Amino acid sequence: MKKLFALLLCALLVFSCAGLGLAEIDEALIKAAQEEGELVVYGSCEEPYLAAAAKHFEELYGIKTYYQRLSTGEVQAKITEENGNPSGDVWFGGTTDPYNESAKAGLLMAYEAKNAADLASDMYRDADGYWYGIYKGILGFMVNTEELERLGLEAPQGWDDLLKPEYQGLIWMSNPNTAGTAKLIINTMVQLKGHDEAMKYFVELDKNIAQYTKSGSGPSKKVGIGECVIGIGFLHDGIAQILSGYDNIALIIPSEGTSFEIGATAIFEGCVHENAAKLWIEYALSPECVELADDAESYQFLVINSAQQPAAVEPFGLDPNNVIDYDFEDAKNNTTQYVTDFFNALGDAADSRFKTE
């Protein structure tokens, strides 16, 4: 009787998923995942979206789903320390530079996902199946217009403007020790300026930085209240703050050009619940998962063909394709070295602002 009930439940779930628009998932995978019974998700997207996705996955498949919100740098440090015996099963959200470093270190498991066929482009997946993209975010500036007016300052329009002495102590960005966003910023400047000029740039920029935040979204959360006057980060985080009531925030795409993140999901090598992890990847690549972001006030551009883009983003006029031709291979191969070079360039300026707990 129990066996019959389990088979009926699997069949019902497959039928339900097909009705929702999810691609047909192997019944054997669903059954194996349910037998494992649990899944542990480390999420580097914003927590409301992470919580919504974990809850929905649990409701769909009857698999107890635990989650913890950590920055990409924190996840990377954790799985590096665990060295093939991870306490988590999957990674969800956050920019791909730390994913690539982790894959290179043998800490991610390759998996060929069926639902990857619905990705808008092959650029939104790792060629070997170590990670898959779920959203895209544009890098830029968020500024407090009231504070700039009070100080008698114009808003910066490009990367080089951030070096002006009048912005000393007004700029926040994230910490390369803990945030994938900061690694993307470093890679972006290397690709725009060349390696040596980029390192010189960061030495000058550091003179104007008041704080390096643990999370990439950290600056955006302090712009509206004026604690941060100029924040470097993803513009969708700024949109979330504007829509929450901070109409004193303006969004700026740097005039010299900018890059973008691909927010990803992946399986940890050596995870305990491997089948549940594979099922999560299939789920994460569905419109039913990625469209939860809109209701959770995460306004990234979605990279799933059949997914509906968040309507709240349209009035801001952001073009997801108005970005540089970001060299993902260079970032994949050299991010670790570039971060080391960043700290070496700063020298004694790499002070307590970069400390991690």
Task: Please report, for each region that a protein language model flagged, where it lies by residue.
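A ligand-binding cleft/hinge motif common to bilobed small-molecule-binding domains
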Residues: 97-101, 224, 229-248
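Short, low-complexity disordered leader/linker segments with a strong preference
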Residues: 1-36, 352-357
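Mature extracytoplasmic/periplasmic domains
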Residues: 259, 263-326
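Periplasmic-binding protein-like
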Residues: 137, 201-206, 212-213, 245-271
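Extracytoplasmic ligand-binding site segments that recognize negatively charged/polar headgroups
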Residues: 40-54, 66-82, 86-227
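Conserved C-terminal helix/tail region of periplasmic/extracytoplasmic solute-binding proteins
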Residues: 320-357
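A short alpha-helix/helix-coil micro-patch that ends at or immediately precedes a cysteine
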Residues: 53-61
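Immediate post-signal peptide segment of exported/extracytoplasmic ligand-binding proteins
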Residues: 22-40, 58-59, 163-169
